[in-house]
Every structure is written in structure tokens, then in C-alpha cells.
């Protein structure tokens, strides 16, 4: 084992593995590759900004401190980190790849696996929360914050463990024949294990939502109200978009785990599938704000404040009687509106 870890700082190991698994090492920085890299980085910056606005909105407004929105905030955090990880992955790809040590390569790829794991477990936590809210039409107990934080913390801990297994030793540095083609320093068995875990979790989430749907449709009006159905529709859309975006990448990884080295040319195009999967982190904030009026107002508040600030600067020296009115909080916009206080209505009353 000591010999294995001693290879982590050997800069020749990465090139050795790429030479073994790839037919050709096309690592030249061409103009088209530069344009593609620039586009991906811009896309990832948009992902970071979008999800940061969602996190700020959830943090600053107490209306969004319910279990449902905290779990959505956790999903936004994983999407934000996914954007950061993909920027790092893009900057450290191409010609830079062959100059990396195995340790740096594991850090580059492991960060992406960690954020993916966090997204999957966030979706599972949301499904469990919906099941609890539907099954128990009452507010959580006084220990709800502790239990939510423990669930979120556990999801990140498991994600760190899953993403960190290769750097802890589950890799193919000493066994070239066991290496993945898409991820040449990862063992095929590790890739197969992770994709299987994710697939089983996603199937379990789908089964949970099917069960919740039938429970809601067959329940009384206090459970199957329009807000409850709208919130269920929102989280179902989030799940569906995740599956659509990641299914091609999961399929490529499953093929990679079973295909002999250099026998499946489609594996050399895997980066297109992962780029498509990244769209999931871009679309999630759009879904949240599209489906929730209050969250949409809160997310747009910093942009409106910035716009009003520019307008105030442009009017300096003008009519002193003309002043900008401060933005009202989203909660004040709904003042006077009384809604039922069961958890399904309490957490779903902002969904359109």
C-alpha cells in the first residue's frame, strides 16, 4: 500500500494511464477547443451566480426556513459547487492533464463526484421530507432543525466518502487492465459501484414520488390541496430534469465499466455527455424561481436593488423630491393573506 501512495506524486503516471486507455492523445489546444472551454466556463459562472442568488434568498427570508426550502437550498449549494468544480475541471483539462500528478487528478475528478453525490442525496432528502409531510399532516417537532441539519450533514459526509474512495486507494494505479477508459485512473469496479448506487437511489426516489402521488390523490382536501399538488409537481420536475440530464452520462459510465479497453469509440466522446449533464445545475434555479412567486421576488431583489442604485446615481443633482422607494420584502407583499398552517400548505403556499 505504501508503494501505491508513493505513486500519487509521480507526474508520469497520468500519461501512462492515458496512453494505455486512449487510442490517441489529442491534447493540443486548438481554437475550437479554446472556444468550447470559454463557453463552458461562462456557463459555469452562470450556474454559480444563479445558485448563489437562490442561497441568499433562502438564507435572508425566514419564510424559506422550512424543511422543504432548506433541502432545496442544500441542492442549490451542491449545484453551485458543481459549477466551481466544472470550471476547475475545464481549466485543468486538455494539455494540462498530462502535467498533473495522480493526486491532483484525483482531486480534479473527485470534486465532481462529490458534488454529484450531494445532488443525488439532496434529491433523496427532499423525497423523504415530502413523504413525511404527506404522511404526518402536522408540524415537525421542536427538534426539526437538529434532524434536518443531521440529514444534510450526513448526505455531505457520505458524498465526501464516495468521492474520496479513489484517493484513499480504490483506484487502478497498479492495475492498468482494470482502468476505466473515460476516467483512466479510476477502477472500473469503482465507477460501476458509484453509478449503481446512484441509479438505485434514483429509482427509490421515483418509487417514493409515485407513492406520494397516489396518497395525495386519494386523500382529503386538507392534504390534496392545490398548493400541495403544485409543490409535488415542482419537486417532480426537478427530479425529472436531473434524470434527463444525467441519464446519458450514467449510460456512458455503465458502458465504460463493461467495455474492454479501446473497444468502444463512443467512450472517447464522454466529455459531451458530461457537458450536457452540467445543464442540470443551470436549470434547477430556473425551476425553483419559475414555480415559486415568493422565491422569484426574493431572488430578483438584489438585481432590482442594483438597478435602482444605478438609477439613483444617474439622478444625483436632480429633483431632490424624487426619491426611490425601498423594496418591500416578499413576506410583506403577501401581508393579509391567510393560509392553512399544515406543513404541506405552509411550505407550498408560494408555489404557482
UniProtKB/Swiss-Prot annotation:
Query: Which of the residues are on side Extracellular?
Result: 1-34, 96-109, 174-189, 256-271
Record key words, sorted: Cell membrane, G-protein coupled receptor, Glycoprotein, Lipoprotein, Membrane, Palmitate, Receptor, Transducer, Transmembrane, Transmembrane helix
GO BP annotations, alphabetical order = actin cytoskeleton organization; adenylate cyclase-activating G protein-coupled receptor signaling pathway; excitatory postsynaptic potential; filopodium assembly; G protein-coupled receptor signaling pathway; negative regulation of excitatory postsynaptic potential; negative regulation of smooth muscle cell migration; negative regulation of vascular associated smooth muscle cell proliferation
GO cellular component terms given for this protein: cytoplasm; glutamatergic synapse; plasma membrane; postsynapse; presynapse
Carbohydrate-modified residues are: 19
Family matches, as InterPro entries: EDG5_rcpt, GPCR_Rhodpsn, GPCR_Rhodpsn_7TM, S1P_rcpt
Q: Does the keyword Transferase apply?
A: no
| Tissues in which the protein is found | Expressed in all developing tissues with highest levels detected in primitive, transformed cells. Relative abundance: lung > kidney = skin = gut > spleen > brain > liver.
The cellular location(s) given in this protein's UniProt record come to:
Cell membrane
SUPFAM superfamilies documented for this protein = Family A G protein-coupled receptor-like
Q: Which Gene Ontology molecular function entries are recorded, alphabetically?
A: G protein-coupled peptide receptor activity; G protein-coupled receptor activity; G protein-coupled receptor binding; integrin binding; sphingosine-1-phosphate receptor activity
- Gene3D superfamilies the UniProt entry points to: Rhodopsin 7-helix transmembrane proteins
Q: Where are the transmembrane segments?
A: 35-59, 67-95, 110-128, 148-173, 190-210, 234-255, 272-292
Superkingdom classification of source = Eukaryota
Q: Where is the lipid attached (S-palmitoyl cysteine)?
A: 305
Task: Please list the residue ranges that the record places on the Cytoplasmic side of the membrane.
Answer: 60-66, 129-147, 211-233, 293-352
Function noted in UniProt: Receptor for the lysosphingolipid sphingosine 1-phosphate (S1P). S1P is a bioactive lysophospholipid that elicits diverse physiological effects on most types of cells and tissues. Receptor for the chemokine-like protein FAM19A5. Mediates the inhibitory effect of FAM19A5 on vascular smooth muscle cell proliferation and migration. In lymphoid follicles, couples the binding of S1P to the activation of GNA13 and downstream inhibition of AKT activation leading to suppression of germinal center (GC) B cell growth and migration outside the GC niche.
Which family does the entry's similarity section mention?
Belongs to the G-protein coupled receptor 1 family.
Protein name in UniProt = Sphingosine 1-phosphate receptor 2
| Annotated source species | Rattus norvegicus
Amino acid at each position: 500500500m505504501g508503494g501505491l501512495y508513493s505513486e500519487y506524486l509521480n507526474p508520469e503516471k497520468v500519461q501512462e494511464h492515458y496512453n494505455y486507455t486512449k487510442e490517441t492523445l489529442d491534447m493540443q489546444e486548438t481554437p475550437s477547443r479554446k472556444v468550447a472551454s470559454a463557453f463552458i466556463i461562462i456557463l459555469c459562472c452562470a450556474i454559480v451566480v444563479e445558485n448563489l442568488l437562490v442561497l441568499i434568498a433562502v438564507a435572508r427570508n425566514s419564510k424559506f426556513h422550512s424543511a422543504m426550502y432548506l433541502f432545496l437550498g442544500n441542492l442549490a449549494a451542491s449545484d453551485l459547487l458543481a459549477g466551481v468544480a466544472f470550471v476547475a475541471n475545464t481549466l485543468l483539462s486538455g494539455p494540462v492533464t498530462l502535467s498533473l500528478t495522480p493526486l491532483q487528478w484525483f482531486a480534479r475528478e473527485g470534486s465532481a463526484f462529490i458534488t454529484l453525490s450531494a445532488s443525488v442525496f439532496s434529491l433523496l432528502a427532499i423525497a423523504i421530507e415530502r413523504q413525511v409531510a404527506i404522511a404526518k399532516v402536522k408540524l415537525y417537532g421542536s427538534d426539526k432543525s437538529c434532524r434536518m441539519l443531521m440529514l444534510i450533514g450526513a448526505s455531505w459526509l457520505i458524498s465526501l466518502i464516495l468521492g474520496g474512495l479513489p484517493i484513499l486507494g480504490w483506484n487502478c494505479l497498479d492495475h492498468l487492465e482494470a482502468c476505466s477508459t473515460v476516467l483512466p485512473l479510476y477502477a472500473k469496479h469503482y465507477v460501476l459501484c458509484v453509478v449503481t448506487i446512484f441509479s438505485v437511489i434514483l429509482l427509490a426516489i421515483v418509487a417514493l414520488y409515485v407513492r406520494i402521488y397516489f396518497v395525495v390523490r386519494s386523500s382529503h382536501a386538507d392534504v390534496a390541496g392545490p398548493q400541495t399538488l403544485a409543490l409535488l409537481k415542482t419537486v417532480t420536475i426537478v427530479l425529472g430534469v436531473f434524470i434527463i440530464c444525467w441519464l446519458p452520462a450514467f449510460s456512458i459510465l455503465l458502458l465504460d465499466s463493461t467495455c474492454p479497453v479501446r473497444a468502444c469509440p463512443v467512450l472517447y466522446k464522454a466529455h459531451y455527455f458530461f457537458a450536457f449533464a452540467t445543464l442540470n445545475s443551470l436549470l434547477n434555479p430556473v425551476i425553483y424561481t419559475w414555480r415559486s412567486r415568493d422565491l422569484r421576488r426574493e431572488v430578483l431583489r438584489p438585481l432590482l436593488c442594483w438597478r435602482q442604485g444605478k438609477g439613483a446615481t444617474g439622478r444625483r443633482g436632480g429633483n431632490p423630491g424624487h426619491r426611490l422607494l425601498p423594496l418591500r420584502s416578499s413576506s410583506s407583499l403577501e401581508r393579509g393573506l391567510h393560509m392553512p398552517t399544515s406543513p404541506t400548505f405552509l411550505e407550498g403556499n408560494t408555489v404557482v
